[in-house]
Amino acid sequence: MAGERAQNLQDTFLNHVRKNKIPLTIFLVNGVKLQGVVTWFDNFCVLLRRDGHSQLVYKHAISTIMPGHPVQLFEPDETAEKA
């Protein structure tokens, strides 16, 4: 793993839904529901796009992210299937 940068689950998830343009529902800590597609993100915020408008959402305000359809980030472990 020398030279490789380990990616956390949050970045892996956000990058997957961004690349595949998967529609999301994002619930904020104050109860507001936002919907759209992630176009960009960094350590502190997510850029959400819907109907030609963009919203910059700070990650500390996000409670839950629900993708529009199931997301598989990793290949299933064959040893887990045999157990």
Swiss-Prot record:
GO cellular component: cytosol
Gene3D superfamilies: 2.30.30.100
SUPFAM superfamilies linked: Sm-like ribonucleoproteins (SSF50182)
Pfam families: Hfq
GO molecular function: RNA binding
Domain Sm: 11-71
InterPro entries in UniProt: Hfq, LSM_dom_sf, Sm
UniProt record, GO biological process: regulation of DNA-templated transcription; regulation of RNA stability; regulation of translation, ncRNA-mediated
Role: RNA chaperone that binds small regulatory RNA (sRNAs) and mRNAs to facilitate mRNA translational regulation in response to envelope stress, environmental stress and changes in metabolite concentrations. Also binds with high specificity to tRNAs.
UniProt similarity note: Belongs to the Hfq family.
Record-linked HAMAP family: Hfq
Protein name: RNA-binding protein Hfq
